[in-house]
Amino acid sequence: MKPSKHLIFALFALAISQPTMAAPQPLDRVAVQINDGIVLESEITNMIDTVKANAKAANQSLPSDSALRTQVIERLILTRLQLQMADRIGLHIGDLQLDQAIENIAREQKMTVAQMQQKIASEGISFSQYREQLREEITLGEIQRIQVQRRIQVSPQEITGLVKLIQEQGMKDVEYQIGHILIDVPNNPTSEQLEASSKRANAVLERLKSGEDFRRTAIASSSGPKALEGGIWDYMNINEMPTLFAEVINGAKKGDIIGPIKTGAGFHIIKIMDARGLQTKEIEEVRARHILLKPSPILSEDRAKAMLEQFLKQIRSGEAKFEDLARQYSEDPGSATKGGELGWAEPSIYVPEFAQTLNSLSPDQISEPFRTTHGWHITQLEERRKTDATDQFNTNRAHQLIFRRKFNEELQNWLDEMRADAYIEVFQPESNRG
């Protein structure tokens, strides 16, 4: 998951409607038990309504209600498992960090927070619900980063090999938008089960070749991680996409359908939805310095922010120097001894909130205090430059591509492991009980 790509407003189009008359309403019920947590029927209904509303707005067709319900329940199960893991390790996105994220989103949308609130209200969405949905999305991104990142290793040999390939391609690569359908098989399947899954996959393939809508088919038939999005994996180049895709799309063009491809997970059908060329570009680097204070049982969130506000006053009045305060107070061991200096770097190497803050500053400007996952910061943008650091760019790019590919693969492995270890029971709706 890329934390810097914050949710746009459409993702918060929660389809929550209230009855206009006080008619008797059925009692809510427990629809799914997940370990010691539950999913209510109303949550499933709300998400189904959201998917339908978004599909209608995008003029997309949908499968049967039962197929859609299955996909929604699976999404809610995986979401709840991740949130339970976040609770277990004490991961919590506080109000101050949430406010900072909202300010960043408003800035990206080129509006104030008040204007953003008005826009959200005009779409019939409660701002408090927007906040809580954003808090959940940030939590999911953080728990995925914490749990999956430590499972990934990128070797120097992998980087060297990919750098060579990038150099040979002259950075003129292609990005693909991939459609993916997975027809799964049970664990330790019998030959009859394998044959049944194979027949299902071939039937799906024939329907697609006959012109059936891919997105609708994926929602109805796929067990893959992107099923609820119509099976669509957004633009990736061959070096960052899951290995399975990379191995089969070489030479493929837009519109090609590939498969079924058998793996241990089942039978895969892949369609090239779109392809676009990549272009080389100059690298913009920034030289910055910062002061970091980490909230703790001794140092509260409010106190950390207040201290940085006081530092700002001292720096602006000439009472103190940035570098001296950084050496004395900053809790970033890598930069404190250097007066807070971070050196030249691309902004994208930093956590999203830090990168966004740097991008908003002019040279010599010092930010207001802001929160990241590391703690509270103030940062000064000292210089910007554009450079033709091709070798370093290729190395960084290679590492990023390999990491993203492995992250996507390990994320799915982690989710599968959590699901396999969890107690999950799906209760049938009243209308289906005999």
Curated annotation (Swiss-Prot):
Signal peptide limits: 1-22
InterPro entries documented for this protein: OMP_Chaperone_SurA, PPIase_dom_sf, PPIase_PpiC, PPIase_PpiC_CS, PPIase_SurA, SurA_N, Trigger_fact/SurA_dom_sf
Domain PpiC: 173-274, 283-383
GO biological process: chaperone-mediated protein folding; Gram-negative-bacterium-type cell outer membrane assembly; protein stabilization
Reactions catalysed: [protein]-peptidylproline (omega=180) = [protein]-peptidylproline (omega=0)
GO molecular function, one term: peptidyl-prolyl cis-trans isomerase activity
Gene3D superfamilies: 3.10.50.40, Porin chaperone SurA, peptide-binding domain (1.10.4030.10)
A cellular component annotation (GO) from this entry: outer membrane-bounded periplasmic space
Top-tier EC class: isomerase
PANTHER family reported in the protein's UniProt record: CHAPERONE SURA (PTHR47637:SF1)
Record note on domains: The PPIase activity resides only in the second parvulin domain. The N-terminal region and the C-terminal tail are necessary and sufficient for the chaperone activity of SurA. The PPIase activity is dispensable for SurA to function as a chaperone. The N-terminal region and the C-terminal tail are also required for porin recognition.
The protein's name: Chaperone SurA
Name of the encoding gene: surA
